[in-house]
Amino acid sequence: MNNIRKTHPLMKIVNSSFIDLPAPSNISSWWNFGSLLGICLIAQILTGLFLAMHYTSDTMTAFSSVTHICRDVNYGWLIRYLHANGASMFFICLFLHVGRGLYYGSYMYLETWNIGVLLLFAVMATAFMGYVLPWGQMSFWGATVITNLLSAIPYIGTNLVEWIWGGFSVDKATLTRFFAFHFILPFIVAALAGVHLLFLHETGSNNPSGLNSDTDKIPFHPYYTIKDILGALIMITALSSLVLFSPDLLGDPDNYIPANPLNTPPHIKPEWYFLFAYAILRSIPNKLGGVLALVLSIAILAIIPLLHTAKQRSMMFRPLSQCLFWILVADLFTLTWIGGQPVEHPFVVIGQLASVIYFMLILLIMPTTSMIENRLLKW
């Protein structure tokens, strides 16, 4: 068995990635989220596959097919809620994974980081299109509002929106193509995740200290396999509790009303994991400006390595940067809260302030603070 593990062409890849992989001896539980994201992706693909067996992507029957899944299909309710809440777990793990990368300077692995940013965009696109499929009120109006943002692009905007819609409004053609894209994108995400791992294993994992760990490596199995299993059990427990006790906690009640193009809901808002970006979009009165801010709120991650002015990689020994990092986290929570509130005083002003603070922290305050820390350490 020992020989086949190291000689068989396929087993050799698995062995060098998950068994004999040299890993730093001091990586904490913050390094668990990569494997949790892999588990989430597999769970989403499997539950999605079973949902697709019963779902119909037609405006007349989409809503009732989801009802049929919940009422008539064996454990259909469980599959549907695992899929919906699995997306929430996916984004919780994603945000924590990105946060870990920012805190410990993992973004210095440029290829791994940039593919991670691409993955984030791909997962967000997948989740957005998936939210449209049940064809409830929030599905329809969310799709209308978000796709309409593309009309802000000069010259080609209107044509682009009508091309995406497949007509002059969100209708049957839109739903069908969104279903097709929602089905294919997770497999593209899986392929990108493979490339993400490939580049990670070229350099090896970072660690909390941010120092080179070549002198102190341990095999991935059994040390980190058992650690990942513990993380997976905790996540599965959390997801099961959510699905079995309050499956609609994170959803919008409006999505239990079939889509009606003649009746606009009082508050159109996306799922909770997009609210921070939605708040940034709404905080700018100009349409094109808002769209640019929305894209930049995520795309800004790609230039984080260029903004790294510190002489140390990790924030572990940089207390000022740590304070700013947690202010950034608090700011993102504030934006998430504002994104779910109506557009009225004082929420508008709070959203604008939080948006300015978000970009100021990343582009100006954190790099400047890192330089101050360098001076304090006489580096």
Curated annotation (Swiss-Prot):
GO cellular component: mitochondrial inner membrane; respiratory chain complex III
Bound cofactor: record note: Binds 2 heme b groups non-covalently.
Family annotation (CDD domains): cytochrome_b_C, Cytochrome_b_N
UniProt: a ubiquinone binding residues: 201
Similarity comment: family membership: Belongs to the cytochrome b family.
Its biological purpose: Component of the ubiquinol-cytochrome c reductase complex (complex III or cytochrome b-c1 complex) that is part of the mitochondrial respiratory chain. The b-c1 complex mediates electron transfer from ubiquinol to cytochrome c. Contributes to the generation of a proton gradient across the mitochondrial membrane that is then used for ATP synthesis.
Entry protein name: Cytochrome b
Organism: Crocidura dsinezumi (Dsinezumi shrew)
Underlying gene: MT-CYB
